[in-house]
């Protein structure tokens, strides 16, 4: 930062910087100092290689189901392991096969993305509710706090009873 301040103090204004540039050669601009620092500190080695998860590299249904995750592999036998049969199956047919709604919608979403080559295949994790979900959060937290207070109250009463039995408390 001191190097930056010294450059600002030396240059003063654009005219002064131009005069110095004519006399001494080019001056390092303030912008080049800022832009020379890297924007990201994470190394490239942490990024996953998604080139193998594209439409050109997936030729069987088992690989497709393993890449999209969410335990869709258990439905492999319904499609007889045939990717073409899966891609030609409609939502209504999947319903008659006995695939539950959330899994069926997930599979259809990935089928659309796969056919149109929109996104590399990967698992979309299911969201987890915190404190019973947004709608129930207040009641769940209130019950949790009430139970905690009740436990503390019972613990205090037990400690007082023990102290009274030992003769430490005289009432």
Curated annotation (Swiss-Prot):
Single GO cellular component term: ribosome
Region entry Disordered, spans: 122-141
Transmembrane segments: none
Cited InterPro entries: Ribosomal_mS41, SAM_Ribosomal_mS41
Subcellular locations according to the entry: Mitochondrion
Keyword line: Mitochondrion, Ribonucleoprotein, Ribosomal protein, Transit peptide
Signal peptide: none
Family, similarity comment: Belongs to the mitochondrion-specific ribosomal protein mS41 family.
Its job: Involved in telomere length regulation.
Annotated protein name in UniProt: Small ribosomal subunit protein mS41
UniProt source species: Scheffersomyces stipitis (strain ATCC 58785 / CBS 6054 / NBRC 10063 / NRRL Y-11545) (Yeast)
Record gene name: FYV4
């Amino acid at each position: 930062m001191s190097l930056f301040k010294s450059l600002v103090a030396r240059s003063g204004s654009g005219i002064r910087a131009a005069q110095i540039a004519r006399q001494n050669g080019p001056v390092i601009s303030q912008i080049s100092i800022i832009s020379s620092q890297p924007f990201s500190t994470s190394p490239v080695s942490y990024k996953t290689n998604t080139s193998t998860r594209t439409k050109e590299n997936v030729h069987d249904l088992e690989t497709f189901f393993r890449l999209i995750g969410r335990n869709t592999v258990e439905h492999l036998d319904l499609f007889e392991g045939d990717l073409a049969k899966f891609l030609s199956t409609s939502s209504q047919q999947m319903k008659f096969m006995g695939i539950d709604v959330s899994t069926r919608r997930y599979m259809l979403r990935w089928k659309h993305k796969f056919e149109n080559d929109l996104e590399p295949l990967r698992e979309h994790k299911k969201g987890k509710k915190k404190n019973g979900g947004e709608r129930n959060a207040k009641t769940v937290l209130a019950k949790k706090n009430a139970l905690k207070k009740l436990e503390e109250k019972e613990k205090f009463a037990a400690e007082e009873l023990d102290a009274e039995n030992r003769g430490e408390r005289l009432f």
